[in-house]
Amino acid sequence: MGRHILKHVFAVGGIYCSFLTWGLLQEPLNTRVWPNSGCTFQVPYIVALVQATIAMICGLIYIKWQKPVLSLSKFWTSHTRDMAIISLSQAISAPLAAYSLSYVDFLTYMLAKSCKLLPVLMVHLIVYRTPIPRSKKLVVLLVTVGITIFTLDGHKPSMTENDVSESSSSSSLIGFVLLGSSLFLDGLTNAKQDKLFQKATYKITGAHLMFALNFFLIVWNVIYMVLVDRQQLAKGLKMLHADPEISRYLLAYACCGAIGQCFIFYTLEQYGSLVLVMVTVTRKMFSMILSIIVYGHQVTLWQWVGIVIVFTGVVCESMGKKNKAKEGNIINEEKVKQS
């Protein structure tokens, strides 16, 4: 009994420690104006490349430690095409989310990325034409209302700021289009992962996904920077040379993300999706609160109301999963994505 509790604390504590630190590193890495470079580190494909490289190495170590029944070579030959397609949506989603930070504040970004149900339902409704239950529609309504309240109250125009307000509204719209596109691709990734698990003839573990998806993320990011945007690599290297502190943030951020993925898959395999969902929801709440405290974000009363409404919707969705678990119909909706 004591050993079981220690394993549980180890799994949950690992997720909290790695992803709370990951969240605290993500904000300055993406939004800080670095002193010597004089600009933000807006090179998302380099960030994704470094993170994927470290995560792939961790995934390989995880496979060696886990020794799954399905060998890596057999998994590779059977699911190469699936991994390439799933990773492509991930490779596009992450930079879109990073670019959205040029137009929306970090708390809005975190709040939107906390709502995994929205993109999943969008994909099932638009792509797979799946009927949406009334309970999920209610959750979507709560989340949408909460984000709207949070965003609108954070952009109240004063009587003498009409021109600035119009410019801000236009920028916010661009930010939400980018963020919404990223969320839709996240939903597409999760839906394709669900299909992969359903059709698999052998048990696919988190370690398999972690290694293969990150391998293809490296491939896609390298292809993009070589064929489409060579300036991004040059800009990134120039900034890393001018501000060496960025490299420390970047490596720490990537390591926390990779370690966090290991803990997510470990928790999923040991305790199931229900425990993982509850840990993920509370972790995201604490990440927002920690960001507000550490970085001194000003949050109005109505914005707090918006945050509470959003997480009420997310908790309702988690409770719905709990009821399904009791009926023996757990649907695995938490795979590779971190908040």
Curated annotation (Swiss-Prot):
What GO annotations for molecular function exist for this entry?
UDP-galactose transmembrane transporter activity; UDP-glucose transmembrane transporter activity
Top-level taxonomy: Eukaryota, Fungi, Dikarya, Ascomycota, Saccharomycotina
| Gene Ontology CC annotations of this record | endoplasmic reticulum membrane; Golgi membrane
Protein's job: May be involved in specific transport of UDP-Gal from the cytosol to the Golgi lumen. Involved in the maintenance of optimal conditions for the folding of secretory pathway proteins in the endoplasmic reticulum.
Q: How does it sit in the membrane?
A: Multi-pass membrane protein
- What keywords were assigned to this record? Endoplasmic reticulum, Membrane, Sugar transport, Transmembrane, Transmembrane helix, Transport
**Transmembrane parts of this sequence:** 5-25, 43-63, 91-111, 138-158, 171-191, 208-228, 246-268, 273-295, 301-321
Pfam families recorded: UAA
Question: What gene makes this protein?
Answer: HUT1
What this protein is called in its record is UDP-galactose transporter homolog 1
Q: Which family does it belong to?
A: Belongs to the nucleotide-sugar transporter family. SLC35B subfamily.
The protein's predominant localisation is endoplasmic reticulum
Subcellular localization, as worded in the UniProt entry: Endoplasmic reticulum membrane
